[in-house]
Amino acid sequence: GGSGQRMGQDIPKQFINVYDKPVIIYTLEGFQRHPQIDAIEVVCIDGWHDVLWAYAHQFNITKLKWVISGGNTGQESIRNGVFNLEGKVGDEDIIVIHDGIRPLVDETVLTDVIMKAQIHGNAVTSLPYNEQIFVVNPENEKTTKQYIPREILRRVSTPQAYKFGKLDWAYHEAFEKEVGIKGSAYTNTMMVELGETLYFAAGS
């Protein structure tokens, strides 16, 4: 549901053409091709729904079933997408969350995140963190006296996957209690703030 303001474009970033194809279509094709994906929902900026449907027809994205409006933040947009699925999917169904602006959907990563979510109830793609992380000294923000060993860090991104029942509960709970929904919060950080244990899947 992002608008691409950081990229200085009038057109939303996911609709920018790359080799005569919008970025969002490259993303959707990764899900369209995957045999374990049954249906696709896109949370989209108002005014671009018809454009997305037209592109989906043009590029044969037959698994696209729902296009709904986003919110003012990323978390509001995901919430809208989750709530729209109430009554449409079962509690044990696996919901994969992915950023439309990330077009390189690796099939093996998608397979692993789905498999781990089926076993554990959730899964987040992860990679080892190779940079050095230092903690800012609260007494002098230009200095540091502490670092975090990178061996205990993981860098996570999308796709992420959750069983729908838990995901739906989490978004109701988070927005009612205003937990894990502000700033740079995402589904994974929200889940941790709600006390859930997350499971790592393979990244790329």
What are the roles of these predicted feature ranges?
Residues 1-50:
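N-terminal glycine-rich phosphate-binding loop and ensuing alpha1 helix
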Residues 15, 24, 81, 99, ...:
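Residue-level signal for inorganic ion chemistry
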Residues 28-32, 56, 85:
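Hydrophobic C-terminal alpha-helix "anchor/cap" residues
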Residues 38-41, 66, 199:
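A structural signal for isolated positions on well-ordered beta-strands in alpha/beta enzyme cores
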Residues 41-42, 97, 122-125:
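Structural beta-sheet core signal
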Residues 57-93:
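Short phosphate-binding loop-to-helix
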Residues 104-201:
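Conserved core of the sugar-phosphate nucleotidyltransferase
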